[in-house]
Amino acid sequence: RARYLLLLMIVGTWQILKQAKLEILAEALPIPILFESRRKKLKRFLKLEILNIEKIWFTCLKEMLKQQERFTIKGLVYIAIDQTSWGAINILMVSLIYDKRAIPIYWEILDKKGSSNLEEQQRVLGKILTVLSGHKIVVLGDREFCSVSLGKWLQKPSLYFCLRQKQSTNVKTKEGIYQEMRELGLSPGTQLFLKDVNLTKEQGFGQFNLAGKWKKTYRGFQTKEPWYILTNFGDLETAIIADKKRFDIEEMFRDFKSGGYSLEGSQLAPQYLSKLIIVIAIAYTSATMQGKKIKDMGIQKYVTRPEKRYKGQRRHSSFYVGQHLYHWLQLHQMFPKNIEELMQISRYRLKDYIKGQRAISLALSTF
């Protein structure tokens, strides 16, 4: 129970500080003991044997996934595999796509720089397929995970995949000739879908479907090249819709770093960093789900700046709303007498204040 309470305080403190460095977290942790004692308490917490992905995080995930309507899209669970790195740290991660963001599911800190290999990719995905057994899964990967060997390994019942391919990858034409994908004849504004094609000149890989598209513009800029997707989906549109969700894991990495928790500033050794990511995963998931509830309740305008819905304006993510909720509620609870007196003075705004108080009550119900 004491560990659980400490975890809740760490998560709440993190939402406000947006810093992953232990010294900064220890400064603000609301436990009435000496600073040095708080710092040591945090270090001991990160050394706990029970604080590991399979014992703690997998248990949370299995409980969340019971709410299938929340995490599935037309009966499918979308997961993305990607890497992020800074300095000597190199993390291979698989995440669950949720509400235009991604929730970390499993990760490994690689003891090398550069791209992961097939064995490492199969290992992390294998862990996930066990946790998600019973669900129809779509695996998404960028060109770093373009291996046809990975595609073959993913050809299993109730499992779909969309893996971006390099333009230099060879594809066998109807005439039996191999040519690079860049030679398939796509031009800006065109697309293609090839069924049952052989990729690469190596033997034994079987056939796949290949989707290709060259958008004229992306976010107002002309695109320089087309993209190609290795998939076992049966049509172009389904493959394109699925592949677009892959970008959500990149948004999650941004939230983990400078856009949210400043994970790269933790300066922890890999064995402690992996445990820290468990806590961040809990904090991130909590903020995202709370933010989604705030949006659904229609009280987002009390927490963050109202969204302008003209073209090009990026909307606030549920994570952004959920994280900023902590700031508003914390300061509200710090100045109850001031707020009460202000309401008495500004009687002409009383109706607005009452609406705001109701919004606060609704916001508190998300905890």
Where are these regions (language model features)?
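Single, function-defining residue in the core of a domain
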Residues: 1-21, 56-58, 72-77, 88, ...
